[in-house]
Amino acid sequence: MKTYAIIATEKGDMKAELYADETPGTVANFVDLAGHGFYDGLTFHRVIPDFVIQGGCPRGDGTGGPGYTIKCETSAPRQRHDRGVLSMAHAGRDTGGSQFFICMNRENTRHLDGVHTCFGQVVEGLDVIDDIRRGDRILSIRIVRE
């Protein structure tokens, strides 16, 4: 059984397979936050074309988090920042919490490999990332197991 996140946004829905077996701490944290509605209504506060869309900051400016930090899991398999990969944002090793980004372009994100934890991959609705603009809202993130 696989774990997926259904990320509903103002621009459409994305379905991402989460790497629960490979990055268990990061996925457990994301699933817990999503399950408690943490992400509901938050914005994509950082959008850089051909690089990333980033959300998950309760302050909406990139400085907020859940009030705790989690460890990086960068030695796991599938740690390539390809287009559509979900990765944990942080301000330095082991400082991630709730902010995550989705990669738009492998060429411009390869330098993040081994630095940020890749914890999922968009498998449906990948075109939505191209439509997201700064300030667009995450309506909800729902976790499903199939």
Regions found by a protein language model. Give the residues of each.
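Cyclophilin-like peptidyl-prolyl cis-trans isomerases
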Residues: 1-146
